[in-house]
């Protein structure tokens, strides 16, 4: 059983919901990333999504775009991100780490070489935002062969056929994008999300995490009523962008603990 499957199995047995935070690797400071990952766990996260910086992050709003730019300016690329995971794994062998990013850096490294390097570093899942549907199957197969869960996005605009296709190739969990548009955008329509998740479950026997637009404990709590996990990205990246350097780790721990408390209430 993969680390991700094990995590969701334990959560289900405890009657709890998953908390999946996102941070951009290398932001706000490259030397802080591993400490931030540990802070996420300390606060009560179940899975970590680690963003791979990319020069044209088309699915991301201005907050995560700026984080990507800052990290790239400090020369943080895919190989550096894998080193962060390796360093994190030196003291944490249980928390799943999912790399989230775009196809270009993986294609440049080579899909097979990436699968091997990611597996050796201790990566558990990979979510590539911009792989077209027809390329998903080969990529997913390569990842699974390396012991990595291929994770895919579904959106309010996803057709029934697309949901069925993703259900066939995905493992780990499904990431449901609650809003049309980019990360960090408007507020969530809870009723629309609640209506959509049963459709996904008809096809996929995987946990469903919901992200985009979750900015506080109250929204996280509301979403957890209909989903298996909540994903929080832009709000965390913004918090780190604004935090004084020496307090960033503590700010992050406290914010995650607040969300965790709301999910467990």
Swiss-Prot record:
Pathway in which the depicted protein is active: Amino-acid biosynthesis; L-tryptophan biosynthesis; L-tryptophan from chorismate: step 5/5
Q: Which domain of life is it from?
A: Bacteria
Q: Which SUPFAM superfamilies match?
A: Ribulose-phoshate binding barrel
Q: What is its EC number?
A: 4.2.1.20
What's one GO MF term for it? tryptophan synthase activity
Q: Disulfide pairs?
A: none
Recorded family membership? Belongs to the TrpA family.
Full protein name: Tryptophan synthase alpha chain
User: What does the UniProt function comment say about this protein?
Assistant: The alpha subunit is responsible for the aldol cleavage of indoleglycerol phosphate to indole and glyceraldehyde 3-phosphate.
Identify one Pfam family in the record: Trp_syntA
Read off the InterPro entries from this record. Aldolase_TIM, RibuloseP-bd_barrel, Trp_synthase_alpha_AS, Trp_synthase_suA
The GO cellular component terms are:
cytosol
Could you describe the subunit structure of this protein? Tetramer of two alpha and two beta chains.
Instruction: Give me the reactions it catalyses.
Output: (1S,2R)-1-C-(indol-3-yl)glycerol 3-phosphate + L-serine = D-glyceraldehyde 3-phosphate + L-tryptophan + H2O
User: What keywords appear on the UniProt entry?
Assistant: Amino-acid biosynthesis, Aromatic amino acid biosynthesis, Lyase, Tryptophan biosynthesis
The EC category is lyase
UniProt-listed PANTHER family: TRYPTOPHAN SYNTHASE ALPHA CHAIN, CHLOROPLASTIC, TRYPTOPHAN SYNTHASE, ALPHA CHAIN
Which organism is this entry from? Ralstonia pickettii (strain 12J)
State the NCBIfam families in the record. Answer: trpA
* Catalytic site: 49, 60
């Amino acid at each position: 059983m993969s680390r991700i499957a094990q995590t969701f199995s334990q959560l289900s047995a405890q009657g709890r919901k998953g908390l999946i935070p996102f941070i951009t690797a290398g932001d706000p400071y490259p030397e802080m990333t591993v400490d931030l990952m540990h802070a996420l766990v300390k606060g009560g996260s179940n899975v970590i999504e680690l963003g791979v910086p990319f020069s044209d992050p088309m699915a991301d709003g201005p907050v995560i775009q700026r984080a990507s730019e800052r990290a790239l300016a400090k020369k943080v690329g895919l190989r550096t991100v894998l080193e962060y995971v390796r360093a994190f794994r030196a003291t944490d062998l249980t928390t799943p780490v999912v790399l989230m990013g775009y196809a270009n850096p993986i294609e440049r490294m080579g899909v097979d070489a990436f699968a091997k390097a990611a597996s050796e570093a201790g990566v558990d899942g990979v979510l590539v935002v911009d792989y077209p549907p027809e390329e998903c199957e080969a990529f997913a197969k390569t990842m699974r062969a390396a012991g990595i869960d291929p994770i895919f996005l579904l959106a309010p605009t996803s057709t029934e056929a697309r949901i069925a296709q993703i259900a066939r190739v995905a493992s780990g969990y499904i990431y449901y994008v609650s809003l049309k548009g980019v990360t960090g955008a408007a507020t969530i329509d809870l009723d629309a999300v609640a209506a959509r998740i049963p459709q996904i479950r008809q096809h996929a026997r995987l946990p469903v995490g919901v992200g985009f637009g979750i900015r506080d404990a109250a929204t996280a709590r509301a979403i957890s009523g209909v989903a298996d996990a909540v994903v929080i990205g832009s709000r965390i990246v913004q918090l780190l962008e604004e935090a004084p350097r020496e307090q960033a780790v503590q700010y992050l721990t406290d914010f995650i603990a607040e969300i965790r408390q709301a999910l467990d209430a």
